[in-house]
């Protein structure tokens, strides 16, 4: 089994009790297991699996992929009436689509009270984590003095052939990021930036993870990806950093939601309670996640200075139109 990068944190937290409803736990134990489809790195999720199993005896099976693929698999299984999963953990835009399709149901965890009211969606619950998108670069290939200083620097001629990003015709969150750039640059500058970015002929990959991997190896030294990969890949010795700019960075929220026909509903509810608990949130932050708790930051350089600008969910029909536009620009 793959060793967790955070096994020491697992040992630290195994003796910490989390408050849960006794009746729910008893019912959850009868379920015996639960299945989660999610986007969280396996190295971060694994300690949570082990802690929860140690506390409850309930097994957690986890399938990890991109947000788009989580959504696609969940919808395919649900439509076929052959769903195996209990919980989906993914970005807000994909959760909205699944909610609209009617496959998610509301579970109001007692842990909601520990989150700011403005961070709680009436249907999806607390915005547990913020996925912050930025520009990551390899310091061994691109010296800090030569690296882009702002987002707009990314399209300068010297970076042509050195860029990687998720394919916006396939990756929902990248399409969302491009469509929300006006929040940082204004509409006119954002439109020009997108055209210029496409003209740079970036390497297109499936999602943010392989984009970060290519930056880490230096194969493509600059990439658009989640900022937490700076910590995650840096922990493995990679010489990576991210472009600060004015610290305003777009991002998406992550939610964990209950499938409306969950095979193991009580175990799933118990896991949601555990996942939103203070100890779990702190564990995730120490592992590089931007959790939505005031004053709790990941060990990413200048994490406390980042000004999170939440991306709007623009709807499935909008993304369908945008994908056509991006197909012409990026392909």
Outline where the language-model segments fall:
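A bilobed periplasmic-binding-protein/Venus flytrap-type ligand-binding module shared by bacterial periplasmic
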Residues: 134-141, 178-182, 253-267, 275, ...
């Amino acid at each position: 089994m793959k060793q967790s990068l955070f096994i020491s944190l697992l040992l630290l937290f195994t003796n910490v009790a989390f408050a849960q409803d006794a009746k729910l736990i008893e019912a959850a134990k009868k379920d015996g297991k639960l299945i989660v489809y999610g986007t969280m790195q396996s190295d971060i999720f694994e300690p949570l699996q082990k802690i929860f199993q140690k506390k409850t005896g309930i097994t957690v099976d986890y399938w990890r992929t991109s947000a788009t693929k989580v959504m696609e698999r969940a919808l395919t299984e649900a439509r076929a009436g052959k769903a195996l999963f209990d919980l989906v953990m993914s970005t807000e835009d994909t959760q909205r689509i699944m909610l609209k399709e009617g496959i998610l149901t509301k579970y109001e965890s007692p842990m909601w009270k520990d989150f700011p009211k403005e961070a709680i969606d009436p249907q999806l619950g607390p915005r547990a984590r913020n996925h912050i998108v930025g520009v990551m670069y390899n310091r061994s290939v691109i010296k800090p003095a030569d690296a882009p200083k702002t987002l707009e620097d990314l399209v300068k001629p010297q970076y042509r052939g050195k860029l990687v990003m998720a394919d916006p015709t396939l990756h929902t969150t990248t399409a969302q990021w491009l469509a929300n750039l006006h929040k940082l640059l204004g509409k006119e500058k954002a439109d020009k930036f997108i055209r210029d970015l496409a003209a740079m002929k970036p390497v297109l990959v499936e999602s943010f993870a392989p984009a970060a991997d290519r930056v880490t190896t230096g194969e493509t030294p600059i990439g658009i990806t989640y900022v937490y990969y700076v910590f995650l890949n840096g922990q493995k010795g990679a010489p990576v950093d991210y472009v600060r700019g004015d610290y305003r960075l777009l991002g998406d929220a992550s939610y964990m939601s209950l499938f409306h026909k969950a095979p193991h509903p009580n175990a799933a509810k118990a896991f949601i309670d555990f996942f939103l608990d203070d100890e779990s949130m702190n564990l995730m932050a120490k592992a590089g996640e931007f959790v939505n708790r005031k004053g709790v930051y990941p060990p990413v350089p200048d994490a406390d200075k980042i000004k999170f600008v939440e991306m709007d969910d623009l709807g499935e029909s909008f993304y369908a139109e945008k994908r056509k536009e991006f197909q012409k620009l990026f392909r």
